[in-house]
Amino acid sequence: GLVGSEMCIRDSSMEPGEEQPFSQYSIQVDAEGFRPFTVSGIELFSKQLSLQEVRMDEVDAPGNPVDTIVIPVNTLWGDFPPKIAESEIKPISETGEIVLSRVVVPEYVVVHDGPPNDTTARDYYVRYKDYIKNVASSEIYSTWPDATLRANILAIMSFTLNRVYTEWYRNKGYSFTITSSTAYDQKFTYGRNIFQSISDIVDEMFQNFLSRPNVSQPILTQYCDGERVTCSNWLSQWGSKYLGDQNYEAIEILRYYYGNNMYINTAEEVSGIPASWPRVDLTIGSTGEKVRQIQEELARISRSYPAIPTVTPDGIYGPATREAVEVFQRVFGLPVTGVIDYRTWYKISEIYVAVSRIAELV
């Protein structure tokens, strides 16, 4: 871990101003048998513990290992596009898709590192808690009052879980959970440092989200900085800081912005990346987005399990898809039917997450 430097004036993170409220450092890590690893732009605040994780690749690691990370500045200081307004509750019937039957905290989210339609951007498989810590460390200052940090983290988590619950991007034909674009979602920076004060709160509260009465989905709690960009009925990041200074509790801060009928709710944890089963078995003749999704997952799995034939993700369940499903079922000890039922759907999802995660770590 990296300990905050006293060179930085603590008060400059307490109100907007001309002085950058954090110092920035670079580190290089060297270890015998591993490629050198460099991180630049690590942010340090006075009296704050900053934590930097480094994953090093062996010298002869295959592929194209990442060995340099450049961390952009916090969104409160830097110039990032403002959030494009959306409705906070999604009309599920619009897509005709069955969404997740309950609110869950996924083990992993898939983060698309760019705007949704940027096909060159990488997708990262990130543990949910690590994702929330990363976003909060990118969006707000760790020096702020505890209640302010909690209110902002709750808004970040509820926003994320709405994307998970509604399968927002999957239903638009994408294969990720959320993007790193501030115009569409929230700031995420692969490999950035996080802050102990934020990390501790996320570890304590990660199963929470924000609810309104008689609404099953987590609320898409949008927010803005409140200084350069103002937003009615959304949380103001700087405004929430001033309310924290006035000893408002986290829920009081949230109700100040989102209204008095906002409540803190609790979700259950699940493993992997949840994606809803279409409620009907997929078999020869089935077509559509769910078929294409499962074909993409099988295609990725077949790279790690070559016995499974490669399928073309065309959204049509033909003989080649049935054959791939039969081999998958045989390999993983399921009844060999060539039909994707509930058990097979979730087993494919589980194995897909596992092989994708291993690829991220290699």
Regions flagged by a language model, labelled:
Residues 5, 24-362:
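Conserved, single-site charged/polar hotspot
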Residues 2-8:
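Short, small-residue-biased leader/transition segments that mark boundaries at the very start
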Residues 10-23:
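Short glycine/proline/serine/threonine-rich loop/turn segments at secondary-structure transition edges
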